[in-house]
From Swiss-Prot:
Alphabetic keyword roster: Ribonucleoprotein, Ribosomal protein, RNA-binding, rRNA-binding
Record has RNA-binding as a keyword: yes
Subunit relationships: Part of the 30S ribosomal subunit. Contacts proteins S5 and S12.
Protein name as catalogued: Small ribosomal subunit protein uS8
Function per UniProt: One of the primary rRNA binding proteins, it binds directly to 16S rRNA central domain where it helps coordinate assembly of the platform of the 30S subunit.
Encoding gene (name): rpsH
Amino acid sequence: MTMTDPIADMLTRVRNASRAYHDRVVMPHSKIKTHIAEILQQEGYISGWHVEDATSAGGVGHTLVIDLKYGPNRERSIAGIKRISKPGLRVYAKATNLPKVLGGLGVAIISTSSGLLTDKQAGKRGVGGEVLAYIW
């Protein structure tokens, strides 16, 4: 069965695993999910990620494994994740009108012609694009 919105599926898996205090979350692999995981690691929301071959476990293809990050008293590093641009309603932002998440405390992931960037990186490069998600 095909998945309508794989990015929303990824964000939901990470949100649910974080709320349940799981140490890692496994999901089907794609290039855009890998780029989102890179951004989450650069911004300090996850401790790491890697791609595993699913054929050894009896599956097909590759899986993306994300290692979640918690504070010293098991406080979550991800307070919330929200999908913004959806297949039924795309949301775009110009370089001059990039969104700020929680007044700059959170991160917006934006798909630009230069690849996936955070709102701060897109602002420095002067590019706009599709607003994929907010993380705070």
